[in-house]
């Protein structure tokens, strides 16, 4: 959509990327066309970054049990099946020893308010990572996921009480802060490069250690009385 286009084009220009295209992951022909074009331009690829998810934001609030069949199916198709579909196509033009990386969230492991079906989808995504890692391992192709802490992004804007979530993580994570996009990017670079040549099927947390916490930290303030 236009909202993403306005962000992608400047980023592509900054990085000197000459190939920017449209891909509809619900349309097999669209995905086929993208990889045919990449093969035509580059011949081979070294990695694939899967950073796509979708759900009706109106169904991320309230009770998960009220998720509609239509939204559940669409969420799973776009957020989960797309990784398998894109990986299958990428494998055909990927060099041996390549890397595939996707993005997940702690809501796959524990119930998070206002995440609902996306939490279920992310759990399925993490399972998909493990199965793909086995499928593609014989060629040395690695498949991993980054589970980042909350960051102010376009996707995060659809999550209710996001500012509260940011503050909660800041006060309760072992490092007493949230994470930055640069820190997530550095972890992605590690997982996409030969520095992680023996790492596959993993969910790598970049969340200031928040995933280790079981309850409110002893020294954390009462967030209900904290003003921004």
List each language-model region with its residue ranges.
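C-terminal helical subdomain
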Residues: 81, 145, 163-199, 204-208
């Amino acid at each position: 959509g236009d909202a993403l286009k306005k962000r992608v084009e400047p980023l592509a220009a900054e990085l000197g990327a000459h190939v920017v295209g449209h891909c509809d992951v619900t349309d097999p022909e669209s995905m086929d066309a993208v990889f045919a074009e990449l093969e035509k331009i580059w011949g081979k690829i070294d990695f694939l970054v899967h950073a796509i998810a979708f759900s009706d934001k109106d169904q991320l609030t309230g009770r998960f049990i009220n998720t509609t069949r239509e939204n559940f199916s669409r969420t799973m198709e776009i957020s989960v099946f797309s990784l398998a579909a894109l990986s299958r196509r990428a494998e055909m033009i990927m060099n041996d020893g390549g890397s595939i990386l996707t993005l997940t969230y702690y809501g796959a492991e524990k119930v998070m308010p206002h995440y609902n079906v996306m939490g279920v989808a992310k759990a399925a995504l993490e399972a998909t990572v493990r199965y793909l890692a086995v499928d593609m391992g014989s060629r040395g192709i690695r498949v991993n996921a980054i589970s980042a802490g909350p960051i102010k992004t376009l996707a995060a804007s659809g999550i209710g009480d996001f500012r509260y979530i940011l503050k909660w993580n800041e006060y309760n994570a072992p490092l007493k802060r949230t994470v930055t996009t640069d820190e997530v990017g550095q972890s992605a670079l590690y997982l996409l490069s030969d520095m992680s040549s023996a790492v596959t099927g993993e969910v790598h947390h970049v969340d200031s250690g928040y995933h280790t916490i079981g309850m409110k930290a002893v020294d954390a303030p009462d967030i209900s009385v904290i003003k921004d």
